[in-house]
């Protein structure tokens, strides 16, 4: 896999309107934070429970991600996808990330922590999972509440359940941010049913079920380029 840039070229964000701004891994028993010697996809996806996000919840998300990524990455053997997603050890969000006036955690600070945890290893994409409210500053608004944030391209994402209306939306937001980390931008067609549509300050994930044809083609080109 072609090495990812050490300097992050962009950050992708999901917004929501109405804001100022013990156990073992399923399929990877005892893996913890260790990595497969030769990741079949060229990288692995680590789901990192943060704070009160439980290991069990992360395992449930993992099962859904394996299923959905198997559809999105349909050219890859299912066993490759199964072997490439694991639940890592729980971490606490650093107190330095807390913005006390709104009781929100700066998403950028969480990304920095996740990026540094593996020393910038571009063979692992770490997705932090939290129930806490997260935020960033964008469009002239300071500390704007968001659902997710990722480096694009990069090795870290963070997703929050705080603004999600349905449990089923979690895998959708997670895949949205993960695909940003692979370099996929927002849907250029602005297709309401596409997982990569910009949220436009609204939570419309209940309407989304997959990628539009344009985003599928863009992802194929990105993956082909990274595999050279």
Language model region names:
Residues 16-18:
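C-terminal motif of bacterial Sec signal peptides marking the signal peptidase cleavage site
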Residues 20-22:
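Bacterial signal peptide processing site
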Residues 1-4:
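Positively charged n-region of N-terminal signal peptides that target proteins for export
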Residues 142-169, 185-228:
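Metalloprotease/metallohydrolase-associated module, dominated by Zn2+-dependent proteases
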Residues 55, 59, 63-173, 185:
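Metzincin-family zinc-dependent endopeptidase catalytic domain
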Residues 38-57:
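Fold-level signature of zinc-dependent metallopeptidase catalytic domains
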Residues 6-11:
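Sec-dependent N-terminal signal peptides
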Residues 179, 183-184:
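Active-site-flanking alpha-helical
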